[in-house]
């Protein structure tokens, strides 16, 4: 086991704080409509330009092990917020930095870290409750567009495009973002289907950066039983190899020899293949496999129908323009099924929905209907250069996540105002214990951090903006884009309540743990053993010398 270095108390916190500051300072320049870009060096290809907080956070790795520990913990805040809400990563980072800074000062002044944490947790819970109470449900397409626009850094065309996509496939519909081959950004609604099963083995991945298997124009083998032996599928595999097209296998399970053979063939490049478990269970699985077969113009290969796997021909396989397999979901885009058959299936499911008395069955049937009839909306992001396309795609992804979050939990005034207004709820808290009271005050100060940063990124003094916004009530706040004090909701400057709430909860959770840290342990750098011994003769004695 390698030797470790340990740092305690003040020295540990100081190092950790320095790491937190380096990461947070790099991330927070991107906050708000007038936030700046960050350029990230890539080991190959052009540098990446981004205004996406989590992309910046993920790139930062510090040389000093102890500073790096602090930076990694704040990176965790950004990643977790991104996973849960899909946006708000920069806000979460700014909040975490503010709580850690104030908390470290309080600990240095001799306060009890555990009581400080209790105060921070109490204040966070009160602020979250206030944010949820202020949330206003999103009803119109225009409001959806506003949320998307703000999250895409004021790009109204992106906001309108996402609102259009949601209108076409419904709020629950599937919307994917791709890079376009042209300079234009466009929206296309493709008939497709998504289900919640992912690839059976990570070896099927074709795009390592996104961790997905992306197969163009594949055949689909839809089999209702388990596949474990290799012999039954050999004829169909050989036919697919000769056709030169990829193959997607949808079956109850693929295991043993069959899975091993598919993986080996994929790795050797002989056959582009991916396997996925069939969605659903029991009778519902059969019905969903039938849906996939109708959508792709294939047949469900079932022993009940007297079709043996050994005798399957290419004509019995489904076809689609594209199949994308992720870790936990699969999307089939543009199946070649007959329109009349798909419509007949949709009518059949609608009839079943009307007949069923079980709420659970009705919900599952509606899900199947949405998958068959709703389709998949694809936003193709275009630009003049690859760098521009990547930067814009980051913003479209953020905007899409923010819009989904807004539909889920409603919207609050943007520009850091919802957090600032939550101060009132936190001020109402009190505690006999002075250290818990100090923890509450830490959150009170931290709630101002995002609006200050947005103002400073716009070239305006943060404290003046905070003072002016606190003089008023409700949705009144600072619009950094126009540098005016206005009713933010009326102007369309809104944030999803879920994003603001998640950012605060994640920041407070990690930052309060940092405040209670008393020791840091990191591995010592390995020392070079020096030059190897030289062969006998001339300069033989140099082997052990240290350079």
UniProtKB/Swiss-Prot annotation:
InterPro entries: Chaperonin_Cpn60_CS (IPR018370), Cpn60/GroEL (IPR001844), Cpn60/GroEL/TCP-1 (IPR002423), GroEL-like_apical_dom_sf (IPR027409), GROEL-like_equatorial_sf (IPR027413), TCP-1-like_intermed_sf (IPR027410). PROSITE patterns: CHAPERONINS_CPN60 (PS00296). It catalyses: ATP + H2O + a folded polypeptide = ADP + phosphate + an unfolded polypeptide. GO terms for biological process: protein refolding. Its main location: cytoplasm. It is an enzyme of class 5 (isomerase). Forms a cylinder of 14 subunits composed of two heptameric rings stacked back-to-back. Interacts with the co-chaperonin GroES. NCBIfam families: GroEL, PRK00013.1, PRK12849.1, PRK12850.1, PRK12851.1. This is Chaperonin GroEL 1. It comes from Azorhizobium caulinodans (strain ATCC 43989 / DSM 5975 / JCM 20966 / LMG 6465 / NBRC 14845 / NCIMB 13405 / ORS 571).
């Amino acid at each position: 086991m390698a030797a470790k270095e340990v740092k305690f108390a003040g020295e540990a916190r100081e190092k950790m704080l320095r790491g937190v500051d380096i990461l947070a300072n790099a991330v927070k320049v991107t906050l708000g409509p007038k936030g700046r870009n960050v350029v990230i060096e890539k080991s190959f290809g052009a540098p990446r330009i981004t205004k996406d907080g989590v992309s910046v956070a993920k790139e930062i790795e510090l040389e000093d092990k102890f500073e790096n520990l602090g930076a990694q913990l704040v990176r965790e805040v950004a990643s977790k917020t991104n996973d849960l809400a899909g946006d708000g990563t920069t806000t979460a980072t700014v909040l975490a930095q503010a709580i850690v800074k104030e908390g470290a000062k309080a600990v240095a002044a001799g306060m009890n870290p555990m009581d400080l944490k209790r105060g921070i947790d109490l204040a966070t819970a009160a602020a979250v409750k206030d944010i949820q109470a202020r949330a206003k449900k999103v009803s119109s397409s225009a409001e959806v567009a506003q949320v998307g626009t703000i999250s895409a850094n004021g790009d109204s065309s992106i906001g309108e495009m996402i609102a259009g996509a949601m209108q076409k496939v419904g709020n629950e519909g599937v919307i994917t973002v791709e890079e376009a081959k042209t300079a234009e950004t466009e929206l296309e609604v493709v008939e497709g289907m998504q289900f919640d099963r992912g690839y059976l083995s990570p070896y099927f991945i074709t795009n390592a950066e996104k961790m997905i298997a992306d197969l163009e124009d594949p055949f689909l083998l839809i089999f209702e039983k388990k596949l474990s032996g290799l012999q039954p599928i050999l004829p169909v595999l050989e036919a697919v190899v000769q056709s030169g097209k990829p193959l997607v296998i949808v079956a109850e399970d693929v295991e043993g020899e069959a899975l091993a053979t598919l993986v080996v063939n994929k790795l050797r490049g002989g056959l582009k293949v991916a396997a996925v478990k069939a969605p659903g269970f029991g009778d519902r699985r059969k019905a969903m496999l039938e849906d996939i077969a109708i959508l792709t113009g294939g047949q469900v290969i079932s022993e009940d129908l007297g079709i043996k796997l050994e005798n399957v021909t290419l004509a019995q396989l489904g076809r689609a323009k594209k199949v994308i397999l992720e870790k936990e979901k699969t999307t089939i885009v543009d199946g070649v099924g007959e329109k009349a058959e798909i419509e007949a299936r949709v009518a059949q499911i609608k009839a079943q929905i009307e007949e069923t008395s079980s709420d659970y069955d009705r919900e599952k049937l509606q899900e199947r209907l949405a998958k068959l009839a709703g389709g998949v909306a694809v936003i193709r992001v275009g630009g003049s250069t690859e760098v521009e396309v990547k930067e814009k795609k980051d913003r479209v992804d953020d905007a899409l996540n923010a819009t989904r979050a807004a539909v889920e939990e409603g919207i609050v005034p943007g520009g850091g105002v919802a957090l600032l207004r939550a101060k009132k709820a936190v001020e109402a808290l009190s505690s006999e214990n002075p250290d818990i009271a100090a923890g509450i005050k830490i959150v009170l100060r931290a709630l101002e951090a995002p609006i200050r940063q947005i103002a400073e990124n716009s070239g305006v003094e943060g404290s003046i903006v905070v003072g002016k916004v606190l003089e008023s009530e409700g949705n009144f706040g600072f619009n950094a884009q126009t540098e005016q004090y206005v009713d933010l909701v009326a102007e369309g400057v809104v944030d999803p309540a879920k994003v603001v709430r998640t950012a605060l909860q994640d920041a407070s959770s990690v930052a309060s743990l940092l405040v209670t840290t008393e020791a840091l342990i990191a591995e010592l750098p390995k020392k070079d053993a020096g030059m190897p011994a030289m062969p006998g003769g001339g300069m033989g004695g140099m082997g052990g010398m240290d350079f």
